[in-house]
Amino acid sequence: MGNIITTNRLLLTPMNENDINFIFMLSTQYETYKYESDNASSYEKIMKNCNWFIERMQALPDDGAIRWIVRRENVMIGEIRLWCENDKTHDWEIGYGFLKEYWGYGYASEAVKAVIQYAFEHFNVHRIAAYLNADNNKSAALCERVGMVKEGRLRENRMVNGIYYDTYCFSILKREYR
């Protein structure tokens, strides 16, 4: 099986149908996705999204998408999504979520950094961007730790529970990642 990533402490494997229950459980944890506009997704919506990622893996490395399950000592602790936003400019987007009990140990930073490196080395990527709720200070700090640059602020372009929020855009270019 390709697209497996290992770090000193973590194993990242491409998501498969057996992982959908974990993704659903993770996505329903309020603290993990409270800044997202679709934080109360139904099982059917989560399953549809997971199947989209599984199908889009076939288009890698020039286009497509992949979702990794992050494991620590064979326990699922989070997930990372990477997908092509524009195959002409080789612009990709990254997203992530981790179980709250694993916050503060550097696992998210370690995994995101490994995915960025893997993407630049194995996929046709020029730029990787992360778009996050401007109130999500922990995610903003993570982006900075892994070498991403804050590009700007999109004003009131996302809605969470009926309230508009701003979005920060962070990115890293292939020439910057080392």
Feature roles, as predicted:
Residues Q58-D62:
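Soluble sensory domains of the PAS superfamily and closely related sensory modules
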Residues M1-K34, G64-R178:
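Acyl-donor (CoA/ACP) binding surface of acyl/acetyltransferases
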Residues E31-E55:
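Conserved GNAT-fold acetyl-CoA-binding loop/helix
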